[in-house]
Amino acid sequence: MYDGKQVLRFVNNYKTKDLYLIGNEMNKRIGTGNYDLKKTKFNVHYKDINNSNLYQEVKSILEDRNIEYSRKTKTNILNGVTFTSGPEFFMTLGLPFKETDRIYQSGDKKGQNILASDIKSKEDIPYDVTNYFNCCMKFLEDIVGKENIVMAQVHYDEDTPHIQAYFLPIVNEVKRKCYK
């Protein structure tokens, strides 16, 4: 469907202590990203939390659905996924990019200027880019279940657009090789 390289990165080790920082990054745009706050208004919120913070949201969902879980601090309580690609892919879909004054320090592009999306209005986001992210979201819903997605957003306010989503690692039965 789409040419070029896409990145699908799953993280399955978020503990309760991580949820506050994740919530701040997603909602207040405080964290490790190169945020351009002028572009934050273009971010797309597929699924937001209803409670005051991400921890309360996860706890509420688990309790409302009568899902048993270990309350130990080492328990993996949330999984995350990021869907993205390089600037070249998004440029083929019509999204404008511009060079920044920052330089790649390693990799294939070492020494080249870092490209960042050049979005000034909603009209700068082509239908094909929106459709790409809609397809990514549909794929995620199909593999983890829409009801297990706690938070999902497209971030246009960083160098390269991406979906960042978090979901509950719910399983109906445990299958282990040692029981076979």
Language-model segments: residues:
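N-terminal nicking endonuclease/strand-transfer module with a His-rich metal-binding environment
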Residues: M1-K180
